[in-house]
Swiss-Prot record:
Gene Ontology BP annotations: translation
Keyword check for Ribosomal protein: yes
Species for this entry: Bordetella petrii (strain ATCC BAA-461 / DSM 12804 / CCUG 43448)
PROSITE patterns according to UniProt: RIBOSOMAL_L27 (PS00831)
Biased composition (Gly residues): 1-10
Record-given protein name: Large ribosomal subunit protein bL27
InterPro entries linked to this entry: Ribosomal_bL27 (IPR001684), Ribosomal_bL27_CS (IPR018261)
Lineage: Bacteria, Pseudomonadati, Pseudomonadota, Betaproteobacteria, Burkholderiales
Amino acid sequence: MAQKKGGGSTRNGRDSESKRLGVKVFGGQQIPAGSIIVRQRGTRFHPGTNVGIGKDHTLFALIDGKVQFGFKGALNKQVVSVVAAE
């Protein structure tokens, strides 16, 4: 006779792969042109001067320089800019 009951089935056992979103370069850091600054879903951070935005809302540097975070407008939207290195 079997000493254990049958295993049965489960509806668990799967998970989605992490998307690795978030800020990749922080304020004050030097970066080369083309570097990713923020990976995001939607525009939590908006592009400022010398920052481009990809079709998946990724923000990237358009020039070599220093990253700067700030707020803009009446709604205080978070803006990311790149300031040229002196």
